[in-house]
């Protein structure tokens, strides 16, 4: 029941946005909204397009997907993440107040951070004349896998130099 109510809320928010901005309430836009809600975690526009074609058997042009994503960003249903120079990642944002990720500087692996410490810290921050809706935090470093590879490579170099 709660999921259905939340889905109805999202559709209502999107419909209100379209009406208030004099935009067409097309089936394609609502299908993109539905697909975005079914995506797990971060996704690219190309991945959303592929999902629409392969999982929902709904064929849209990439341009329609991109323009619908733009509308979903503008009304706050999606949030965009510029995590690399390659492309923008999107995430379903409705009802969320924080987006926290650890990003490996070597391989680019992106992992969600589930620690609530940041949430508690942000909740006590005073922001005069600003009521914040959400926040994003990106922590960059080297993941355990890349650290092991680096250590292994360093050991090989040291062993080679000893000979």
Task: Name each region found by the language model.
Residues 1-38:
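Intrinsically disordered, low-complexity serine/threonine- and proline-rich regulatory segments
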Residues 26, 44, 64:
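Ser/Thr-centric signal marking residues that sit
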Residues 36, 65-76:
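Basic amphipathic alpha-helical segments that dock to polyanions
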Residues 38-44:
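Short capping segments at the starts of secondary-structure elements
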Residues 44-57:
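DNA-recognition alpha helix
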Residues 77-163:
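Non-DNA-binding regulatory cores of transcription-related proteins
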């Amino acid at each position: 029941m709660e999921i259905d109510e939340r889905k109805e809320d999202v559709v209502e928010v999107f419909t209100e946005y379209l009406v208030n901005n004099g935009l067409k309430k097309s089936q394609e836009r609502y299908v993109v909204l539905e697909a975005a809600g079914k995506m797990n975690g971060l996704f690219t526009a190309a991945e959303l397009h592929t999902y629409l074609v392969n999982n929902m058997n709904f064929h849209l042009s990439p341009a329609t997907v991109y323009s619908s994503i733009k509308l979903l960003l503008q009304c706050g249903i999606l949030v965009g993440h510029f995590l690399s120079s390659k492309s923008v990642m999107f995430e379903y944002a409705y009802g969320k107040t924080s987006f926290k990720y650890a990003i490996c500087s070597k391989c680019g692996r992106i992992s969600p951070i589930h620690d609530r410490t940041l949430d508690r810290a942000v909740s006590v921050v005073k922001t005069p004349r600003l009521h914040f809706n959400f926040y994003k935090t990106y922590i960059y470093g080297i993941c355990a896998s890349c650290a092991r590879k680096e250590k292994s490579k360093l050991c090989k170099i040291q062993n080679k130099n000893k000979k």
